[in-house]
Amino acid sequence: AALAQRAAYGEDVMPAAYEDIERAELILMIGADLAQDHPVLNARIAAARADQGVELLLLAAPGEGTSIEADLRIEVPRDRMASWIAGLLRHCHDTGVTDGDYLARNVSVPDDFWAQLRTRHDLWSVARSCGLSPVELRALYDRIAVVPRIVTLFGGADEGLARAVIDFHLATGRIGRPGAAPFAMTAAANGMGGREVGCNASGLAAHRGFTAEAMAEITRFWSAEAMATGPGLDGAELADAVRDGRIRALLSISGDGIDPAWLRAALDAVPLAIRSTPWADPERDGRGIALPSASWVEKDGTLTGADRLISRQRRLFPLPGEAKPDWWIVTQVARAMGWQAAFHYEWAAEIYREHVRLTAYCNDGARLLNLRRHAPISNPAYEELTPWRWGELPFDEGRFPTPDGRARLLPLS
């Protein structure tokens, strides 16, 4: 969902918080795997249903999620869920449920947006493709359209689904209010933290893109002698670059010991492969360099949850043998490559302070990610850090971090 959020809001910001589960009237869960992969979230939803009377509407692929307790379960093929949401958006527009005032004040709508939506997502076409009757689908849409506080839970990997969900919430004004927001679930506990510090190939650190201004600011902040000038490679593109010789060295940081097939192929093909991993892999003995790192329960640092909550992760067990933190390993590799001055870190708190200061650097309010309050944090204070959420209630005044202050509806395929 990172690309969709950046395109719609102007910044990769999650509008929701877990407290919105209790504040909502209706939770629309898209995909049964969300309940299975996020048991704490599932327990929270169950408590909200029992204590607050929150309704749960589950959109699940045929045969999936049959054991999930929901007020209503709708079977829709996985590859048609984005179309189902787009049909809901068109129905809201055609029946006058979209928030015209909110759209006029706070959202830019492409000239042909509604025309394109009308030709591709009419009630009958969506019903036929999803295996539902038009009468049944209209009743479902009517039921959802009149609920003012809706939280939509969805997986962030499907960009088409993310665009449809975000468009629905923007067009109906169900955003920037307690209990009303799109909520993309991250696959990893620190998924948002990784995006904030620039681990996605599509952006720079601290929610900066590859604009000339952003690159100049980061170059000054880091006193960088060389800076990336455009998005990097990801997934299959990275494997292709290894095969054709554009990439000669690869550093892999693995936390669960399970590398995807494309990464294993890349590590086998690259001349220099370095793996920071807590797991021994007999199949890879003698192939590349393996550096022992901390497993999840041995890690020590901060992480950012899906709802912008920064919390302190403390090591449960001492590091065994020669194992070191991943950040320390990256620092040593960088120093060995000749970048000693840029990688001077000796403590995890130093990295946190630098990240905090970078979010505030040249930030006059154009970006919501601003951790300025922690810029002077000391090492002892870092050790005692308690959870805190940045961004308060994003977009509550209808303003977005775009040049004109307006969000954007995203064209749907």
Predicted regions and their residues:
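Cofactor-pocket helix-loop regions in the catalytic cores of large enzyme subunits
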Residues: 1-396, 405
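Segments forming glycine/polar-rich beta-alpha architectures that bind adenosine-containing cofactors
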Residues: 399-413
